[in-house]
Amino acid sequence: MVRFTSEKRYPDPLMNTLKVFILLVILVGAGQVFFRNNRNNLKKASQQIVSSIYGSPPLVMKGGDPYVRALMRTISSSEANYMNPYNIVYGGYYTDDLTKHPNQCISIPTGPNRGNCSTASGRYQFLNTTWQEKANLYHPESSPNQRQNYSYSFEAIYQDEVLYNWLTDDRAWNKDIVTLLKEDKVEEVLELLSPTWTSLGYGIEDNVMTKHLPKIYRKLLSEELEATSDENEAISDDNNV
């Protein structure tokens, strides 16, 4: 009688390598599909995490009215809620070159303007045309003899200064924003500004931060008022030395 014995078989190393490779390809592909389909949700979640941990970073600009400073940080928390807001370009991209407005037109993936592109950049998401117009009026480098298409520095301090000067120009808004803020009419101010920054509410592009903005403003205002008080005390102490 012929007896058959089972032969112990060992896995083929080449076959195992091929299986691992195929599995990795499948996992990478699935990951890309998941990320693409959930990119906006992931972005919103990350914004909430950053906001809860860091709030809205202090301004680079020193001085100025604390009520307006708090408003500027509130605009930033809705428009550019990232770790380095001054360097942000629309879509969550970053630029290292702030010698001038980045002027990169990034495709808009969702919302009513889908299919168009946006040049919004910096902490306050200035469009290139808006930056040029407002820099001509409010940038420290501006002058009556400056040509209209002059390339103004987009460094962080100038982003702050241009916006501060714009917000405090009553003629630009036909309202006294500082007085409204001191009367705690922040909702009225946000509505006034919403045609310019639509994420502030009352517009067409609310985001996860929009409904929290009045509360965010009041929190930031308390920080700015405290900082101003500390600065005044320090100055007083220096004068008494």
Regions from the language model: what does each represent?
Residues 1-14:
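N-terminal Lys/Arg-rich, disordered targeting/topogenic segments
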Residues 13-16, 76:
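Hydrophobic transmembrane-helix microenvironments that flank and shape a buried ionizable site
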Residues 20-149, 162-175, 179-241:
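Cell-wall polysaccharide-cleaving catalytic domain and substrate-binding groove, primarily
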Residues 151-155:
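A short, structured beta-strand-centered segment in the mid-to-C-terminal lobe
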Residues 159:
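Hydrophobic (often cysteine-bearing) scaffold residues that line and stabilize catalytic clefts
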